[in-house]
Amino acid sequence: IQFAETLEGSIRQTGVHACGILISRDPLTDHIPIMPTEGESLMTTQYDGHFVEPIGLIKMDFLGLRTLSIIKTCLDNIKKSKHIVLNENEIPLDDEETFKLFTRGDTTGLFQFESPGMKKHLRALQPNRFEDLVAMNALYRPGPMEYIPSFIRRKHGEEPIEYDHPMMEPYLKDTYGITVYQEQVMLQSRALGLFTRGQSDTLRKAMGKKKFELLAELKGKFVEGCKNNPDFVQGAKEKGKDVEELVNKIWGDWEAFASYAFNKSHSVCYAYIAYQTGFLKAHYPAEFMAANLSNNLSVITKVTVFMDECKRMGLSVLAPDVNESYNDFTVNSHGQIRFGMAAIKGVGEAAVEKIIEEREK
């Protein structure tokens, strides 16, 4: 019992955020206690992550994505095989061939869009604008997935688009009247409930972290703000709705939304990367597939999937050749992919480098 009482209330273990980096203008030790952590090259904070922001530190999430390496490898392949220097940041966001690829569901190898379920929804949605891809990226996750069929029907005019209040239309028009992003709720809270920027950001945090007690506190402010907003009151009357009931209806929908709330900035970034890979696959298929294969050399299941995709696309993959193959998969001037020797089981990079060295003598 004595030992149990001693241990009671103590922390069992500490965890480390996979990609959270704290930034400060002064030494971090002036603000928080830090400690070394096994297996980590950087020091970590002894404070729980929830308490870092309130004391004035910025936490940035720096994600390392394999897809970025695939894009870089693909651009290198294009330069070598076609002598074209392509800048991924200059890829147009209205390319017809790219959207055709998405509408066919030919998205194997495309970041965030290659699951069978996503392919099925893309074929039904027939996306023809970048905003559709952003919305699908946010909707295709547990919770909001149930809204995808309605989203698709509304896009094609098969289901009426309705707004609880006229003031909500500017913020929900792009998503066919369905609340998809946290930012939409933030903007509406300011327009309808007269929230300040700070209060709307607090609402975002409450939704993102699913802090239902804080949401309950904010509800009172929202109800009061809507009642004191003459534009909201007038709009409710035009709709023939009771102000109190309408406010509670809107807030109730937001509370349900809080269980799957997603931020648009995140979706835009991911959809942008997916669109870039879609453009590369549509216009430079051999170079793109070679890049995918090269970045998954040691994962035989991935290599098999991408080889099958090459076959489906009608791309020619040439067998390994000591006179032509390199460590990675490459593309020749005829648009054929040459198998990378490093993908051969039992052949290491050192052996490949030796072969290349010998043939170049």
Regions found by a protein language model. Name each.
Residues I1-K361:
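Noncatalytic, beta-rich nucleic-acid-contacting surfaces in large DNA/RNA-processing enzymes
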